[in-house]
């Protein structure tokens, strides 16, 4: 069976980033969002329109001189930040500040607030639709936007994948006019798909980035490490998940829906009449996966990097490219495939996993689904960035370190956020050439 062709990415060594603590400050150019508030008086998401700022070296952090000149007319690139389970926009406080400082004035940075806290339990599909509506609201309220990117942590990556399938349109905007674009959807065509076909919320899709996202669901010690491979815990996890984390739990364990129907995460690896999951991903110029190779007890290395067990190698420890805790970067080319399937034996395995959730039944079912999901997702290319917090003060906080959930507790991930920002900046530079 086809396996993704991955090659290492070569780094240019950057001067070390000054990992001083940064706090986001409201921009004088920000346009406040009106009419929204979270439950119990929670703080709503806000616009952070990044403007050119002086660095500690006295330079101006912008994508290019061309982008800097554009910023005088206002930012045109919308960057959506999506938090994970039982979280809120405040998870991105540090990330917003760093992105604002490093990216310059051509970006509107917006932290999503439509799925805060227990709303993340309502289901990936429900949360994805909420996020899609929120993004449309933002786009409609902002003038001059031309491009869109997403950065999502953990479960938020699945919300974002669902949302872009709704926001995807087979139209290209050209100087106020639009022309239909009709790419073919078959496996081989998608694998050779040229980024740039189609738009997201009417904007040109640029970057789709996830950090520690369970793209293949959660099951067993390699997908949900805190179970420690103990059969009793694995046996209890799936049936209890819906009671603890609602519909979202069943979807993550691939046990949602009728036995005869494929689970949502499998559906999300192919195109359908009303939701173009793979075409939406393929429309982005760059797709990047950040994955913890160890110490992440919520989301395992395999599921967050969309790899098979045999593709996992011994974790590396030496940082690359001058970014602390980034230990490996590689690009996996798209692989031709006829797409994912849900054969009758998978339906029988799902029924067994639902009715008698012992380790043997669930493992057989999940292995089948895992392979099918990989078949679907590898039809687009991915840049994969492996992260290892083995040398940090709190390595077991890897799941929250990777996006610096709290700048005082999880600041070991500062190098990861810097790498994310510079990856986006590199895209800007390439586009301006």
Give, region by region, the residue ranges found by the protein language model:
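Patatin-like phospholipase
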Residues: 2, 44-51, 55, 62-71, ...
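Single-residue recognition of alpha-helix boundary sites
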Residues: 94, 165, 223, 262, ...
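N-terminal cationic amphipathic segment used for targeting or macromolecule association
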Residues: 22, 28, 43, 236, ...
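Flexible, membrane-associating and regulatory peripheral segments of lipid-active enzymes
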Residues: 1-144, 281, 366-367, 377-397, ...
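Beta-sheet entry/capping signal
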Residues: 78, 108, 207, 287-288
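C-terminal catalytic-base region of ester-bond hydrolases, centering on the histidine
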Residues: 271-433
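Aromatic/acidic cage segments in peptide-binding pockets
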Residues: 96-107, 130, 176-180, 224-240, ...
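Serine-dependent carboxylesterase/thioesterase catalytic core
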Residues: 83, 112-117, 125-264, 269, ...
